[in-house]
Amino acid sequence: TLDYLQSLYEKKLCTYPRTDSRYLTSDMAEGLPVLVNLVANAMPFRKGIAISCDEAQVINDKKVTDHHAVIPTRNLQNADLSGLPVGERMILELVALRLLCAVAEPHTYSETAVTVECAGAEFTTKGKTVERPGWRALDAAYRSALKNAEPDKENEDKILPELSEGQTLPISNAAVKEGKTSPPKHFTEDTLLSAMETAGKEDMPEDAERKGLGTPATRAGILEK
């Protein structure tokens, strides 16, 4: 991933890649709406989705150390993305998605919790109703555009019918299932990088300049050794 980002940086299609910052600096706020609109027009997955830009969500000088977050550059406007290697194009689209989602409208929904009693035992379920898709519309469009993309079951909304307090419901079926808990998953290169980034987080003061093991520029090299 870092190699792809480095190549995109050398082609002037994205900013400096060796950073773990998630924020931009205040001097970038004025030009951000133009950049967001340009990036959105260059990305095929955003067709038909309205784009907004709330700069306040990503501008924070205090949370930027040496370099701001990785974002696409204005050179996308005249770039032929179809000519990029597949890996570079996919990484560039992912960087663009993260920027567009970060400044998009919030995803808003209402949640309903239902508790039912049966044979003296209580059972609870929850369901969501989306009010405004917000940034999730972009995320869903990006995922659906990927070939062989697995459905995002973790964020799949469970829709409940209209219910009222004290209502009696028929039981369609019931079953007792036995199972075993799963052991923690083995570390992968991706989860190791994340663990290095947050190592010792609980023991560090809030205003610490750096946290974790290594830096964005050295963590991948440490794992390779």
Features from the language model and the residues they span:
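Core catalytic DNA strand-manipulation module of type IA topoisomerases
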Residues: T1-K225
